[in-house]
């Protein structure tokens, strides 16, 4: 498959302080090179602090807060990892609701490393196959999802990966899914039924 064009597509990057720098910067670069219009969305305005593991690195300017946006404003959602970043996001009702809006509207979502924690919190993991940083596998399973140890997993428009080493494969699948666009709409209740039916 050739290079994916995201010209005319608008992508929200949902992140908070303590995001893993490489997991935001490299996918953002891939999105930018594909022609996407990108906005950093966070739980507060100003800047958010990036980290290389536990070492503070660069800050990123926030374009909009979660209170100012909805899934209707974007074509796709990307959530970078880092331990503190998704932990803050999943504790913020507006951030969780935004992720849920993307999922129920069928718009593609990409999440790497610890970011699937936010998918768990939003009820998006239920009935889906995901990967993540390995320590999240129990959380994914307890939320009704199936966890697998693969560099990248795509389940109906949801792209997940485990760690920074997976970024090349993650970026490729993210661009493919974001270019494909909206998948079938479904609500969280339907996802719950899908899991019950599979049991």
Predicted regions and their residues:
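Catalytic nucleophile serine of serine hydrolases
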Residues: 113
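Extended, subdomain-level signal for the structured scaffold at the beginning of enzyme domains
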Residues: 1-105, 109, 117-129, 137-199
